[in-house]
Amino acid sequence: MTKNTKLNIAFYDRYMMTVEEAAVYFHIGYKKMRSIVKEHEGAKWILYNGNRIMIKREQFEKWLDNQSAI
């Protein structure tokens, strides 16, 4: 694979996604998604890749299933 090659993997097949991608996928506003991440620092569904915040999709889905409001 070359340096500039990008894989096009559907959101539902991804293990992790960026905050922006998660906001689109879960139909949550970007600012609200950032707020949720900030409120839950250290949650198991958050992974820090350097300074980039990644959301573990399946774990976030499980957390979201248990919420009555966000």
Question: PLM features: what roles do these ranges have?
Answer:
Residues 1, 16-17, 33, 54:
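Detector for methionine-enriched segments
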Residues 1-3, 66-70:
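Short intrinsically disordered terminal tails
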Residues 2-3, 13, 40:
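General secondary-structure edge motif
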Residues 6-32:
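Polyanion-binding surface elements
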Residues 25-54, 59-62, 67-68:
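Major-groove DNA-recognition helix of helix-turn-helix-type DNA-binding domains
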